[in-house]
Amino acid sequence: ELAIMKGRVDGLEARVNGIEAGSFSETTSMSGKVEMQIGAGSNGAAIVGDNNNEEQTTFAYHYEVDLNTSFTGDDKLNIEFAAGNAAGTNTVQGITGFGESQDALTIEDVNYTFPLGRWDVSVGDSMDLSKNFPNACALGTIVDAMDDCGAKNAVDAGGDVSVSLGTEFADGWEFGFGFSGDSGTSGIATKESTDGLGAALGYSNDTYGFTFGYALADGGATANSDTTYYGATAYYTPEGMGTLS
């Protein structure tokens, strides 16, 4: 009887393991951050638009909350909520990276990342085409022109409806490339759409690292409006010191 019972227990355990292996299991975590900026303008020419005020002191903030869900343990569904009071027009290079206005809570990013062989693949809306690019820069700021060590447009290219792939193909070496299509009515990869594509190659170890990036921003139907970006980032860590980038 003990042998029969043991056989039944073993059979039940095998069935439970089979159910767990094919079951839907999710884990969701939440993270967030708040960025703030205070600044004053001189009585010189306006940086953006026409403004006759001689002096301007402004305060801007931006906060975001990320929900990350994994269904298999190897994938990730990311949904990002964001809000802020900075004017949406003040996002030109050299000012700030804030894009929200009127304190409106918006869904800023939705993307899904999963493994495909040796590649990490990400697809999403309002997602950077450079999501899976290597990047050797340790500097991050809220000012666009200073972000990613001044190489933002190349190694941290933005995007709309995007796909991004990245892989580590050798010890310390990584490669990534991506494509972004226009989510508007112009279609994806058409003559009228404002698409983008890019690639980056990087190497890193415990002491130093570097990345070379390339991106092309298609100007759409506007003649001679395509823009090409090249960028490089690097870091070096002397023994016993923090990272210099």
Protein language model features and the residues they cover:
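Beta-barrel outer-membrane channel/assembly domains of diderm bacteria
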Residues: 1-130, 143, 147-184, 192-208, ...
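Long, hydrophobic, well-ordered secondary-structure blocks that form the structural core
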Residues: 138-141
